[in-house]
Amino acid sequence: MQRITVLGATGTIGVNTLDVIARHPERFSVFALTGHRQVDRLAGQCRQFRPQVAVVADAAAAGELARQLSGMNVEILHGEAALVAVAASGSVDAVMSAIVGAAGLAPTMAAVRAGKQVYLANKESLVVAGRLMMEAVAASGSRLLPIDSEHNAIFQSLPADFSGDLDASGVERIVLTASGGPFRGWSAQQLAHVTPEQAVAHPNWVMGRKISVDSASLMNKGLEVIEARWLFNAPPGRIEVIVHPQSVIHSMVRYRDGSVVAQLGVPDMRTPIAHALAWPERMDAGVPALDFSLLGGLTFEKPDQEHFPCLGLAFDALREGGDQPAVLNAANEVAVAAFLEKRLAFMDIPRLVQKAMHQFAGRVSNSIEELLELDAEVRRHLLCSLAN
């Protein structure tokens, strides 16, 4: 039986993870659940899964959770140190890293350094600290299994014995598919008037607000390009993005002999979650079978980088190296939050990100602490700029 900590249990990935775990009580035992400030949802999850530990953001949330779980034998902790503790605990075999944003970086690194099997849904761990994260994986013997549908699809489409050498495996290119988001085909005039309500309405996937905006701007795909570089040791010139509006093909691998291997499925995050949790086996995810007779057609087109420049900015950050991906990520988080609060126009998101990349060019951090300091510095600078 696998003992697991779920970081970010109350978010979309966390909820889907627990849905899969609930289908296989004989395989999994939940050691810890974390839920930031969604106390009501976390309390319900604690009643169902009976973890030994629950972690929230602060003392106020911890007090409310304790009140709701009165009489239950669960240790309630709060703060980043508690997240790190449950991620690295000797009582767990594996960690689902599903906290959104840079807040997930420290506990994910702690899990890796402790040699855990890490189910990686937190993009920022590789976007912000890819080099450091992969060095830690190599040093500790940890294993990263990707949860993003695209990276999980690539993982499934590569040879089972893939060891990080594309040439040795006969791989030409990795192809990430993108839905194109809700604004695919829109004009510049239309994009100038996009509202947060429109941006969070993804055509194919059920996701959180931040990642929905990233999908709409194609920044999500840009972050995935950076992740793919580290997960599969793929230079930017061997990563390709294609728009596939139906979201049935989740990603592909082009091989030297002309073959293309793809992973298909109904757009449901429980599939990649179940694949990772059961790897190298397979188990039921509760997902309906893909009915080819109902598909109609599968279409593809090049991404529109003129109207959606965030994808190009991510490639730029990857090529420039150093801390540019971390700067891009921090700036994007600030910009998206401002957009959701209706303080920034949708098309100003890439402008703000590009401005930050110019202002913080040339930085190179050599520790998680330095990266987090840079992250905070970028955020402070941009928040001050927005306030003025």
Curated annotation (Swiss-Prot):
Molecular function in Gene Ontology: 1-deoxy-D-xylulose-5-phosphate reductoisomerase activity; manganese ion binding; NADPH binding
Pathway where it operates: Isoprenoid biosynthesis; isopentenyl diphosphate biosynthesis via DXP pathway; isopentenyl diphosphate from 1-deoxy-D-xylulose 5-phosphate: step 1/6
Alphabetical list of InterPro entries matching this protein: DXP_reductoisomerase, DXP_reductoisomerase_C, DXP_reductoisomerase_N, DXPR_C, DXPR_C_sf, NAD(P)-bd_dom_sf
GO BP annotations, alphabetical order: isopentenyl diphosphate biosynthetic process, methylerythritol 4-phosphate pathway involved in terpenoid biosynthetic process
Positions of Mn(2+) binding: 148, 150, 224
Cofactors, names only: Mg(2+); Mn(2+)
Protein residues bound to 1-deoxy-D-xylulose 5-phosphate: 123, 149-150, 179, 202, 215, 220-221, 224
TM segment ranges: none
Pfam families noted in UniProt: DXP_redisom_C, DXP_reductoisom, DXPR_C
Reactions listed under catalytic activity: 2-C-methyl-D-erythritol 4-phosphate + NADP(+) = 1-deoxy-D-xylulose 5-phosphate + NADPH + H(+)
Enzyme Commission numbers on file: 1.1.1.267
Keywords: Isoprene biosynthesis, Manganese, Metal-binding, NADP, Oxidoreductase
Gene3D superfamilies linked to this entry: 1.10.1740.10, NAD(P)-binding Rossmann-like Domain
Positions of NADPH binding: 10-13, 37-38, 122, 124, 208
NCBIfam families tied to this protein: Dxr (TIGR00243), PRK05447.1-1 (NF003938), PRK12464.1 (NF009114)
Family per record: Belongs to the DXR family.
Task of the protein: Catalyzes the NADPH-dependent rearrangement and reduction of 1-deoxy-D-xylulose-5-phosphate (DXP) to 2-C-methyl-D-erythritol 4-phosphate (MEP).
Name of the protein in question: 1-deoxy-D-xylulose 5-phosphate reductoisomerase
Organism: Laribacter hongkongensis (strain HLHK9)
